[in-house]
Amino acid sequence: MPRRAENWDEAEVGAEEAGVEEYGPEEDGGEESGAEESGPEESGPEELGAEEEMEAGRPRPVLRSVNSREPSQVIFCNRSPRVVLPVWLNFDGEPQPYPTLPPGTGRRIHSYRGHLWLFRDAGTHDGLLVNQTELFVPSLNVDGQPIFANITLPVYTLKERCLQVVRSLVKPENYRRLDIVRSLYEDLEDHPNVQKDLERLTQERIAHQRMGD
């Protein structure tokens, strides 16, 4: 569950510590991406009707942003040593990348309740955690206080970390020249991929829903 600042002072301190920036439409390419300042834009009633007609006859994705039309002020805090790529899942469940956050910085985002965000290493696409989980869903603000999304490194397995290091040192075309077990060639070539992670998270969500039935 997103961490809320206990008071405005804490919110200000958290923002200063993370080097928070607030991006307007011009800096964020808002007009091109349909973003409101640094966050995605909600659809109006007419657009919703058109979306529903287009979606008729095909299943709606399990993981997608909900068009709640309820604003939520969020601060993305990059507390990892990696350059972070925020990714918003739009209303069709398609990943939409947003401007990167350098280590130790933050950004105020104008998002909405029910929107889905995930975060990746901008260079390697390794998965990162947000508030100790893989998906971030903004809730409503309480007394105008922003929701903090703290982005951190997960505890990678030894194998995962070794694969990351080898990928950083060896070009993909040279993987199979390494004197290692053959199965590791395939592991090295299986680069992190947002779409694959979304498929896995979707299956986990479906399994969890079935267990709850």
From Swiss-Prot:
Q: Where is this region: Disordered?
A: 1-65
User: Region Interaction with Elongin BC complex: which residues?
Assistant: 157-166
What does altering residue 154 to L do?
In VHLD; type II
- Known outcome of mutating residue 135 to F: In hemangioblastoma
- Outcome when changing residue 158 to P: In VHLD; type I-II; abolishes release from chaperonin complex and the interaction with Elongin BC complex
Q: What is the effect of changing residue 188 to V?
A: In ECYT2, PCC and VHLD; type IIA; uncertain significance
Quote the annotated effect of residue 80 to R. Answer: In VHLD; type I
Under which name does UniProt file this protein? Answer: von Hippel-Lindau disease tumor suppressor
Species name: Homo sapiens
